[in-house]
């Protein structure tokens, strides 16, 4: 017989032992694995012949063989072997992070995640990616990171068959099907499907711009916009086209460019069934179907009220934009601004393209310039049927390419 103290010491040691299942070869961590018989109470697993001193430990072992996971999450239907695993998982949905780091005040769902994070303060990162050499404090973080190299997306949406590399991304995606928006803004009552979207939105009320560039002192509300901006200074273009090896600073620019090679035109007009490579081109085209603004003098129609106002100035010979230096007048405000900039020889160029660092006075000039890089020719001449990168002088007689 063992004294209570001896039994306690034996159990403490046994908690630290990992056991390998002889049938499946899996490493399993079982509390109080039986090595020495205690009080004659032995529970043996019929599958792998392992012995245990507690019935609960035997049940856990048997579930590794049967695959049974009786604890189910009501939010995402994920299942677990132990109730404690379910409890930890549910914190993801509730955004509950009870484990806080004393060094930097970061908080975590699970105590193991906190332990992994604390290694970063100690300078210890034990898990290294074999492909790119990045280090991680937790094996789970390394596993998720490796999916960026392998392209593995193990989390499947049962509604639309979309796949995701993270379970949290799947949870958020499912809300697009259910319409659930659990995160509500207290200022304007706008609701969002993700907490990060709510946090970003709240900055429109507070004016907070936490992401600041140390090169030019520009600041941003969103981290993603900040990352894209930094590439202006570094010249980094991480997104490469596999067909022509052109590189881009933004993934969205690469996606649009690739349509030049594939011929894909995902934006379709429901009126005439014409298709377009860009959503902006579709919106501009759709306006041609609804000529709602008419000139009473010539019965000419326009897509925008601003175009009608400019047209009417021709009849009235009105030039509302006056230049004080020489009393020149302009029909269009944009012509006046352009002339003003030219005469003052200002170097203010507000619209900058990150691919080649060229800058422009007007957003329309920037949009036209972008077509040079992606190889798109959105305008077609009705006379020669040639594709053009820029709108031809006889733009009224030219229609956009589908």
From Swiss-Prot:
Ranges annotated as C2H2-type zinc finger: 43-65, 71-93, 99-121, 127-149, 155-177, 183-205, 211-233, 239-261, 267-289, 293-315, 351-373
InterPro entries to which the protein is assigned, alphabetical: Znf_C2H2-type, Znf_C2H2_sf, Znf_C2H2_type
Localization, UniProt: Cytoplasm; Nucleus
An annotated GO cellular component: centrosome
GO biological process terms, semicolon-separated: positive regulation of stem cell population maintenance; regulation of transcription by RNA polymerase II
Modified residues (Phosphoserine): 391
Keywords from the named record: Activator, Cytoplasm, DNA-binding, Metal-binding, Nucleus, Phosphoprotein, Repeat, Transcription, Transcription regulation, Zinc, Zinc-finger
Tissue specificity: Ubiquitous. Highly expressed in heart and skeletal muscle.
Main subcellular location: cytoplasm
Membrane-crossing segments per the record: none
Pfam families referenced in this protein's UniProt entry, alphabetically: zf-C2H2
GO molecular function: DNA-binding transcription factor activity, RNA polymerase II-specific; RNA polymerase II cis-regulatory region sequence-specific DNA binding; zinc ion binding
UniProt key word Transcription: yes
PANTHER family per record: C2H2-TYPE DOMAIN-CONTAINING PROTEIN, ZNF44 PROTEIN
Purpose: Transcriptional activator. Important for maintenance of pluripotency in embryonic stem cells. Binds directly to the POU5F1 distal enhancer and the NANOG proximal promoter, and enhances expression of both genes. Can also bind to numerous other gene promoters and regulates expression of many other pluripotency factors, either directly or indirectly. Promotes inhibition of MAPK signaling during embryonic stem cell differentiation.
Family: Belongs to the krueppel C2H2-type zinc-finger protein family.
UniProt subunit comment: Interacts with POU5F1.
Note: Significantly enhances POU5F1/OCT4-SOX2-KLF4-MYC (OSKM) mediated reprogramming of mouse embryonic fibroblasts into induced pluripotent stem cells, and can also substitute for SOX2 in this process.
Name of the protein this chain belongs to: Zinc finger protein 322
Species: Homo sapiens (Human)
Lineage: Eukaryota, Metazoa, Chordata, Craniata, Vertebrata
């Amino acid at each position: 017989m063992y004294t209570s103290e001896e039994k306690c010491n034996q159990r403490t040691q046994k908690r630290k032992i990992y056991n390998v299942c002889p049938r499946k070869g899996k490493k399993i961590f079982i509390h109080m694995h039986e090595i020495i018989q205690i009080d004659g109470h032995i529970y043996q697993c019929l599958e792998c012949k392992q012995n245990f001193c507690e019935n609960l430990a035997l049940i856990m072992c048997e579930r590794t063989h049967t695959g049974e996971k009786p604890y189910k999450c009501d939010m995402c239907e994920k299942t677990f072997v132990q109730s404690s695993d379910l409890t930890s998982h549910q914190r993801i949905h509730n955004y509950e992070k009870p484990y806080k780091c004393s060094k930097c005040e970061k908080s975590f769902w699970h105590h193991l995640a906190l332990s992994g994070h604390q290694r970063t303060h100690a300078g210890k990162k034990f898990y290294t990616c074999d492909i790119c050499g990045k280090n991680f404090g937790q094996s789970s973080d390394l596993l998720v990171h490796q999916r960026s190299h392998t392209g593995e997306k193990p989390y499947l949406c049962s509604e639309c068959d979309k796949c995701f590399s993270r379970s949290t991304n799947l949870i958020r995606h499912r809300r697009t099907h259910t319409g659930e928006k659990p995160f509500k803004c207290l200022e304007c009552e706008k609701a969002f499907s993700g907490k990060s979207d709510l946090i970003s939105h709240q900055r429109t009320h507070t004016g907070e711009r936490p992401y600041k560039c140390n090169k030019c002192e520009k600041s941003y509300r969103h981290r993603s916009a900040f990352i894209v901006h930094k590439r202006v200074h570094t010249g980094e273009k991480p997104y490469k086209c596999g067909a022509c090896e052109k590189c881009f600073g933004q993934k969205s620019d690469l996606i649009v460019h690739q349509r030049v090679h594939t011929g894909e035109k995902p934006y379709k007009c429901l009126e005439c069934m014409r298709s377009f490579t860009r959503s902006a081109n579709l919106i501009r085209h759709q306006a041609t179907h609804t000529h709602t603004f008419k000139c009473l003098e010539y019965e000419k129609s326009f897509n925008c009220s601003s175009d009608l106002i400019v047209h009417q100035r021709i009849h009235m010979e009105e030039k509302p934009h006056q230049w004080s230096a020489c009393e020149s007048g302009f029909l269009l405000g944009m012509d006046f601004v352009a002339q003003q900039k030219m005469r003052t020889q200002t170097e203010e160029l507000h619209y900058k393209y990150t691919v080649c660092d060229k800058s422009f006075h007007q957003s329309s000039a920037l949009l036209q310039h972008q077509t040079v890089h992606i190889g798109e020719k959105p305008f077609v001449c009705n006379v020669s049927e040639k594709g053009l990168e820029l709108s031809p002088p006889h733009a009224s007689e030219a229609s956009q390419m589908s």
